[in-house]
Amino acid sequence: MSSIRERNKELILRAASEEFAEKGFAAAKTSDIAERAGLPKPNVYYYFKSKENLYREVLESIVEPLLEASAPFNQPGHPAEVLRAYIRTKIRISREHACASKVFASEIMHGAPHLSAERTEQLNAQAAHNIACIQSWIDQGLMAKVDPNHLLFSIWAATQTYADFDWQISAVTGKAKLDDADYEAAAETIIRLVIKGCEVQEPV
């Protein structure tokens, strides 16, 4: 019974991510979510109680990976290695959580009305920590004197664009869906821009 419950919740959550990403919170309908999930509409309310709760769960499904992406900043490490790992993880999140990433981006653009105060505080605290780490590397002469805030913003923009603007990327590349080689090229390109552009010293 538990496995059926988890499977149904996962189906609904995935369908909701797609619906909210395509239509936004206001326009998305639970009936469409249920149809996309291949389940009766009452199941949506049975497992999630309301459309708003379901929307919050979609946000939660992307917030946790975003926080975990900063793990390299939370332990001792060389800046080049930390930045490489961070960028690769951010690219992977954009690939594996594309719809939820779009929902999160839309939520942020609208002032994050559905994001809990606790999650907002956690995200802000982690960003502040990452910025402090970058500033520390600058102070130690391990990289160029760039603005750490804008470096972090640039990494966010460069990596998240592969989820948030996938339609544009598909139009330019002529591919309906990027493959492993494309994502590897994306990660390597961003890494090179950051490491070389910010003159980050490589570990000896």
Enumerate the predicted regions with their spans:
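Hydrophobic alpha-helical connector segments
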Residues: 71-100, 145-155, 184, 204
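Hydrophobic/aromatic residues within well-ordered alpha-helical segments
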Residues: 8, 51, 58, 62, ...
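Amphipathic alpha-helical linker/stalk segments
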Residues: 58-85, 121, 127-136
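C-terminal peripheral helix-coil segments that are non-catalytic and often amphipathic
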Residues: 92, 96, 124, 128-140, ...
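N-terminal intrinsically disordered/low-complexity leader segments
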Residues: 1-7, 14, 202-204
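Short hydrophobic clusters on alpha-helical segments that form packing/core surfaces
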Residues: 12-20, 90, 194
